[in-house]
Amino acid sequence: MNDRATVAERDCPACETRAATELPRFSRDGWRVVACEGCGFVYLRNAPDYALLVEEFAWEKTYAIEKVRRRSDGAFFRAVDRATSWRTKLKRDAGARYRKVFGSGRVLDVGCGGGEVLPEPLIPFGIEISAGLHAIADVVMRKRGGHAVHAPGIEGLKTFEDDFFDGVLMSSILEHEKDPKALLRGVHRVLKPGGKLYLKQPNYGCTNRKVMGPKWCGFRYPDHVNYFRVSDMARMARETGFSFRHVNRFAPCADNMHALLTKA
């Protein structure tokens, strides 16, 4: 672990309780995964700050490291990858899913990458922390009437007016966010009444995690700083002004949860 990459130990991002139980089985290389003694939420106690997360622990880097690790674990993981190749079809179907969820109007993609996820006729807007990806996304989105903001999620949301968006997409975002409640409150502010937030993120409560233990693909150090169960996500949604629906509740082995939150 790079000591420069750490900040003061975090309290629970779900309930702000200080006391937490160490989970050494799920900790690695000095990165300490803990369970809150107040609400049971699992999170990384010593999370890196944004600047170092971008420079030293970017998604592209940690993903590559994880891919090498899975290969080194041998035939078992290769078999798992082959058995779950259906996941590539889910990626192809994402555009149709978002069109069905949002219908039309202005939709914000938080962590938009290159800006090509949201299908027509949606008017795409984005927030992206990577300078290179933001530059690409901004060009793509401006051609369709939107634009992209270069900023972390919470700061990027501040650039938009209240009740501006018909929908918001956050795919693989909340597991990286040190203050997930603040991010959700920001989304709530920019959504119109009745607007929808579609979430996808690792499901710490899934069957695969219980079977795979520390080798579960949802563990990534140190850029995954929150580990949500469905119950954690539902509670946080209610506390920040949303109703909650677990979209893929009949897929207990799925590594990710899909959820639809609606602004009251």
Describe each region flagged by the PLM.
Residues 45, 199-201:
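Hydrophobic residues in well-ordered beta-strands that form the structural core
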Residues 236-242:
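A structural motif corresponding to the C-terminal end of an alpha-helix
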Residues 176:
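Phosphate-binding active sites in nucleotide-utilizing proteins
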Residues 181-196:
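A short glycine-rich, Lys/Arg-flanked "PGG" loop and its adjoining helix->strand segment in the class I
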Residues 202-226, 231-236:
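Short, glycine-/aromatic-enriched active-site segment of Class I SAM-dependent methyltransferases
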Residues 1-163, 167-171, 180-184, 248-264:
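Conserved N-terminal segment of class I S-adenosyl-L-methionine
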Residues 116, 194, 204-207:
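Feature marks short, surface-exposed loop/turn motifs that line or immediately flank catalytic pockets
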